[in-house]
């Protein structure tokens, strides 16, 4: 099921002029905080329909025309990031309050790792990948790449079913964004860990508008070198405790994440020491598809 991604070192961080001017702007007296965002950025949430009919939750943060004018720009490049994690707040618009405060309306990354891009007037786009939170469809833990060497432009149909992967979702999303935002036609994609994997998929999509990517510490091979296994050895603590919540399927789109089935109050070493794998797996039953798949494939095979 999982195809090992062979990623050239040159792909790890591809920085172009798209991303080159951000440092200076943060030093020009623009302090990006929630109040500043309220004055200079708008927020809208849309469901972008992709080629198989599923809909991807997309939060779009756009500079106002007044702000673009002040910094001498008419249009903005797009910075896209994709995640399986919550990117709350969902539903709130600028000017609305959460617990009586404007703070919380904006995705927190806008004042963090995205602050330089925001100061430069970028359009910031945050998506939940399919099957997570408000995005429809079924989540698969690192979907295999099926689009082929030419990228994700063409729709592939097998036995009457449209074939999709994270690259096709990115390609279709970029098409929508180019048509529905005030942009320069230039897109960058960045992300860390899971986000790094989705950034890699964005690269493989080969959309001509994607000019720069930064897949940082990407998840790429669950069996050899990531949080599920290290060189084939099961990473029990992370897979079991983290997976007890993250691997659960959303029954329907929701702004609220799934609770964790695992509640370990004692010393975790002692907890695992006293339990065979069969007992640990029986605790989950059939509720965690990825855990069940790992138990069915203890050795490196075509699944990985």
What is the role of each PLM region?
Residues 181-193:
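Alpha/beta-hydrolase fold nucleophile elbow
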Residues 30-74:
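N-terminal cap/lid segment of alpha/beta-hydrolase-fold proteins
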Residues 70-178:
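Cap/lid segment of the alpha/beta-hydrolase catalytic domain
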Residues 1-12:
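Bacterial N-terminal signal peptides that target proteins for export
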Residues 100-103, 107-113, 119, 144-155, ...:
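Accessory cap/linker subdomain of secreted extracellular hydrolases
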Residues 10-20:
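Bacterial N-terminal signal peptides
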Residues 135, 193-194, 217:
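Catalytic nucleophile serine of serine hydrolases
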Residues 191-201:
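Glycine-rich nucleophile elbow surrounding the catalytic serine of serine-hydrolase chemistry
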């Amino acid at each position: 099921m999982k195809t090992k991604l062979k990623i050239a070192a040159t792909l790890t961080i591809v920085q172009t002029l798209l991303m080159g001017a951000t440092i200076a702007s943060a030093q020009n007296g623009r302090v990006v905080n929630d109040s500043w965002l309220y004055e200079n950025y708008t927020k809208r949430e849309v469901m972008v329909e992709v080629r198989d009919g599923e809909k991807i939750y997309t939060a779009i943060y756009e500079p106002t025309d007044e702000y673009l004018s002040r910094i001498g720009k008419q249009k903005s490049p797009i910075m896209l990031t994709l995640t399986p994690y919550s990117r709350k707040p969902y539903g709130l618009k600028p000017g609305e309050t959460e617990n009586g405060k404007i703070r919380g309306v904006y995705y927190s990354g806008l004042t963090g790792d995205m602050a330089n891009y925001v100061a430069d007037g970028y359009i910031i786009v945050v998506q939940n990948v399919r099957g997570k939170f408000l995005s429809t469809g079924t989540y698969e833990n690192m979907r295999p790449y099926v689009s082929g060497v030419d990228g994700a432009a063409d729709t592939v149909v097998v036995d009457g079913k449209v074939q999709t992967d994270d690259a096709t979702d990115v390609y279709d999303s970029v098409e929508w964004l180019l048509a529905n935002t005030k942009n320069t036609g230039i897109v960058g994609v960045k992300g860390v860990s899971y986000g790094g994997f989705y950034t890699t998929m964005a690269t493989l999509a080969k959309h001509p508008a994607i000019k720069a990517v930064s897949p940082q510490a990407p998840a790429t091979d669950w069996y050899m070198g990531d949080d599920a296994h290290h060189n084939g050895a099961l990473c029990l603590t992370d897979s079991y405790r983290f997976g007890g919540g993250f691997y659960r399927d959303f029954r329907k789109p929701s702004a609220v994440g799934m609770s964790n089935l695992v509640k370990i109050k004692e010393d975790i070493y002692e907890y695992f020491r006293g339990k065979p794998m069969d007992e640990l797996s029986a605790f989950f039953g059939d509720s965690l598809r990825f855990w069940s798949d790992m138990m069915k494939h203890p050795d490196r095979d075509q699944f990985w």
